[in-house]
Amino acid sequence: MKFYIILLFMIIAILSFSQTAPKLFMPKVFEGLPNIRDIAISPNNEEIYFTIDDYKYKIGVIACIQKQKNGWSKPKVVSFSGNFRDIEPAFSSDGNILYFSSNRPLDKDSTTIKDYDIWYVERNNSKSPWSSPKNLGKPINTTGDEFYPSITENGDIYFTSSREGTKGKEDIFVSRLKNNAYTKPESLSEGVNTANYEFNAYVSPKEDFIIFTSIRKGEGSGRGDLYISFKEKNKKWSKAILLETISSSALDYCPFVDIKNNKLYFTSSRSAIKNYYSKRLSYSDILRIYNEEPSGKSRLYTIPFVIENFKKQ
């Protein structure tokens, strides 16, 4: 009897782990591609935008897949991308503006790359084409780099920057949309930003929680882990909590939450390749383990995510 009780607990533990461990997202769709990162799902859940990055991070293109009757379409590079390094797409609340970061020049006739700015494209509806890219301009963009836009339902924009006024290295900033103009960006409170690196934040549409990556010695893997913070009654952010069930020894970043379907997506370069194999590897073995996922290539992962569970911690 004791044996069966122990066995029952083991089965429950295994099932519990299998339900909470991050899983590769659409591995067949991204098979054969180099690094895949970033994800933006349209508000109507019918489009998925992501970044295809080369191994040296020299060129990056934003691509999309669209929902069809029998699944999803094949990836297609969007109309406004393919010449420079375009990364980190993010939708507005109505799905008719797409923000992204790019090192493209301000002069459309130039081929000289610059620092990373936040750009955007517009459309009338999900069936209409995107406009030409427009630079978001000051006060958000500077002569330094601006990364990873995330937009609230009222149009405020959160992004990453190392500009003057940071609390450490890279910080997460917010700029409020007031009277159709953006306010001077402010570094988030100490619950989020520290003397370390904080970057690539997803903020919920209602701004009640934020998920971001930080590199903090003595916490997590130290290579970049996901943290969550909640907006408190005093409008400041609570002390960030490490998302331990998601963390790996690799860089985990670029979070996105599908609020409607309670799912968290993120990018990771985690690997299942071992540093020792008892059986000597053959050439075919090497090809197999290098092509199986996860193999250290940047890929998208997903995990069930119920925000109330984290509020209890």
How should these model regions be labeled?
Residues 19-313:
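Short, conserved micro-motifs composed of acidic
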